[in-house]
UniProtKB/Swiss-Prot annotation:
Transmembrane segment boundaries: 33-53, 77-98, 113-133, 178-198, 226-246, 288-308, 320-340, 347-367
Protein name according to UniProt: Cytochrome b
Protein family according to the UniProt entry: Belongs to the cytochrome b family.
Signal peptide: none
GO cellular component, one term: mitochondrial inner membrane
Result of altering T203S: In strain: Isolate MVZ 185904
Subunit structure as annotated in this protein's UniProt entry: The cytochrome bc1 complex contains 11 subunits: 3 respiratory subunits (MT-CYB, CYC1 and UQCRFS1), 2 core proteins (UQCRC1 and UQCRC2) and 6 low-molecular weight proteins (UQCRH/QCR6, UQCRB/QCR7, UQCRQ/QCR8, UQCR10/QCR9, UQCR11/QCR10 and a cleavage product of UQCRFS1). This cytochrome bc1 complex then forms a dimer.
Binding site for heme b b566: H97, H196
Binding site for heme b b562: H83, H182
Binding positions for a ubiquinone per the UniProt entry: H201
Cofactor remark: Binds 2 heme b groups non-covalently.
Function comment: Component of the ubiquinol-cytochrome c reductase complex (complex III or cytochrome b-c1 complex) that is part of the mitochondrial respiratory chain. The b-c1 complex mediates electron transfer from ubiquinol to cytochrome c. Contributes to the generation of a proton gradient across the mitochondrial membrane that is then used for ATP synthesis.
Cofactor annotation: heme b
Gene: MT-CYB
Length: 379
């Protein structure tokens, strides 16, 4: 008798995606981050659902409702900090996942890559709106500054900002709609994840060598299921340590002060995972130019497949490109540091230099180096 997992209409879809899926035999731990992101999304949706049961999206009670969750709800503090630090873990996994795609040339699967970019934007939008909900000082002023950037759009900018705010400033209407969208978006993200996987399973996985692995495939289960479970344990241990020992390590102390439109914090900054983009935004003196640079810092990923001129897919055997890749990583760390610093000398010039380097490496240095490697290998 044929196994039910191969005949049942629903089970056979799961079977072909997670059990009998042919996978390259050489996948390293860098291929764990996709499944880790799935776990992060699950944790965020679950903790978020329970938090939403106690949260009130009204300017008068939002801050107090978060305090109530932490003090009065059973394990509310755990839910709140799992959700807040789970977002940080989500972005760590996201950036490592994107970095792996860049290093090993996974972007040549253009459909999967483009859905991934869409997912990145959706998760960033979700995280931004979530940061507004506790209604602390940084929530309020972060929302004001970031939404105000849209006023740089010619002709319709000011009206667009007021339409998003639902008034003439960030207020009750803004908080209510941000809560609605923050609740809705993760489910859209989950749907996009399905599309992401659908496109990935059309082509099969890439591997560290970048060479087609059709001749050497192994079943996903038990090999990669066990490997993924080990990844889950490591990540959840790290998250638990963060939540239980230093839950406020990555947060901003200003967010423990209730939102006050009459008092501006000395340094308005977003969560750490947006600091690199915030530094790029601040490094351009012109408002519209800064907004365009901000959007392009992420959207530039969409043109990476077009800029791939190397005869080799992966960077595994391309030492010059590897040097540039790690330089790009160093530039991103520098931008993240600068984004959290005040706008004064020498931080301004460091931020501007790092911003220019970021775009130069991706747009010019990497393609040029690839051509040079092709020439050196007589390809």
């Amino acid at each position: 008798m044929t196994n039910i997992r191969k005949t049942h209409p629903l089970l056979k879809i799961i079977n072909s995606s997670f059990v009998d899926l042919p996978a390259p035999s050489s996948l390293s731990s860098w291929w764990n981050f996709g499944s880790l992101l799935g776990v992060c999304l699950g944790v965020q949706i679950l903790t978020g659902l329970f938090l939403a049961m106690h949260y009130t999206s009204d300017t008068a009670t939002a801050f107090n409702s978060v305090t109530h969750i932490c003090r009065d709800v059973n394990y509310g503090w755990l839910l709140r900090y799992l959700h807040a630090n789970g977002a940080s873990m989500f972005f760590i996994c996201l950036y490592l996942h994107v970095g792996r795609g860049l290093y090993y040339g996974s972007y040549t699967y253009s459909e999967t890559w483009n859905i991934g970019i869409l997912l990145l934007f959706a998760v960033m939008a979700t995280a931004f709106m979530g940061y507004v909900l506790p209604w602390g000082q940084m929530s309020f002023w972060g929302a004001t500054v970031i939404t105000n950037l849209l006023s740089a759009i010619p002709y319709i900018g000011t009206e667009l900002v007021q339409w998003i705010w639902g008034g003439f400033s960030v207020d009750k209407a803004t908080l209510t709609r941000f809560f609605a969208f923050h609740f809705l978006l993760p489910f859209i993200v989950a749907a996009l994840v399905m599309v992401h996987l659908l496109f990935l399973h059309e082509t099969g996985s890439n591997n560290p060598t970048g060479i087609p692995s059709d001749s050497d495939m192994i079943p996903f289960h038990p090999y990669y299921t066990i490997k993924d479970i080990l990844g889950f344990l490591i990540m959840l241990t790290a998250l638990s340590m963060l939540v239980l020992f230093s839950p406020d390590l990555l947060g901003d102390p200003d967010n423990y002060i209730p939102a006050n439109p009459l008092n501006t914090p000395p340094h308005i900054k977003p969560e750490w995972y947006f600091l690199f983009a915030y530094a790029i935004l601040r490094s351009i003196p012109n408002k519209l130019g800064g907004v365009l640079a901000l959007v392009m810092s992420i959207l530039i990923l969409a043109i990476v497949p077009i800029l791939h001129v190397s005869k080799q897919r992966s960077m595994m055997f391309r030492p010059l490109s590897q040097c540039l890749f790690w330089l790009l990583v160093a530039v991103l760390f520098t931008l993240t540091w600068i984004g959290g610093q005040p706008v004064e000398h020498p931080y301004i010039i460091i931020g501007q230099t790092a911003s220019v380097l970021y775009f130069l490496i991706i747009l010019i240095f990497m393609p040029t180096t690839s051509l040079m490697e092709n020439y050196l290998l007589k390809w």
